[in-house]
């Protein structure tokens, strides 16, 4: 009975520490209105499969991997797509910012899926390169290559230039 209480306490601790991160990920990737369900399903799957986890890496990366699979399953079931970026940037801002945001969304959509997901996990979720690799089922080096290639493609697609007009 003591071992079971230990596992329950560990699961509760992980939920407390990582629920907000998992929910944020699910809000971006789950079909509309299903983010909370996806987050709950993520933790349910984690609890069911926790014997396979064995603290091999950071729990957050493992949970994001599960969330990614849950959201993909839900999207297939509902034939939905990713949530769109908001049309306007909160707080107003320069009207050109909206154009920039649309251009960025279009450029991101043209990237291969693995590169797009790597960028979102790294810069949107704040995962390390190693955690990105773990979440996507690739090595740290493959994740770094995917990130580098994605950034290079975005720079070329968006014609990014520095303050002196040189291509970056």
Could you say what each language-model-derived stretch is?
Residues 68, 72, 130, 136-162, ...:
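DNA-recognition helix of helix-turn-helix
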Residues 118-122:
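A short pre-motif secondary-structure segment
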Residues 37-44, 57-69:
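Structural recognition of an alpha-helix C-terminal capping motif at a helix-to-coil junction
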Residues 48-55, 64-85, 97, 160:
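Arg/Lys-rich amphipathic alpha helix in sigma70-family domain 2
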Residues 2-13, 23-41, 51-54, 140:
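Short, charged helix-capping/linker segments at alpha-helix termini
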Residues 23, 43, 112, 116, ...:
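C-terminal flanking helix
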Residues 9, 80, 85-109:
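Acidic, proline/glycine-rich intrinsically disordered inter-domain spacer in sigma factors
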């Amino acid at each position: 009975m003591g071992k079971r209480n230990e596992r329950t306490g560990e699961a509760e601790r992980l939920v407390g520490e990582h629920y907000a991160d998992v929910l944020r990920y699910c809000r971006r990737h789950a079909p509309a209105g299903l983010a909370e369900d996806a987050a709950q399903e993520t933790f349910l799957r984690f609890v069911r499969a926790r014997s396979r986890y064995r603290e091999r890496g950071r729990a957050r990366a493992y949970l994001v991997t599960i969330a990614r699979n849950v959201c993909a399953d839900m999207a297939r079931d509902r034939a939905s797509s990713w949530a769109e970026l908001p049309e306007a940037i909160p707080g107003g801002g320069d009207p050109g910012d909206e154009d920039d945001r649309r251009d960025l969304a279009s450029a991101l959509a043209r990237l291969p899926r693995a590169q797009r997901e790597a960028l979102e996990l790294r810069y949107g979720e704040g995962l390390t390169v190693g955690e990105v690799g773990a979440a996507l089922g690739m090595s740290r080096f493959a994740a770094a290559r995917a990130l580098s290639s994605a950034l290079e493609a975005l720079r070329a697609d968006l014609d990014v230039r520095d303050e002196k007009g040189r291509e970056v």
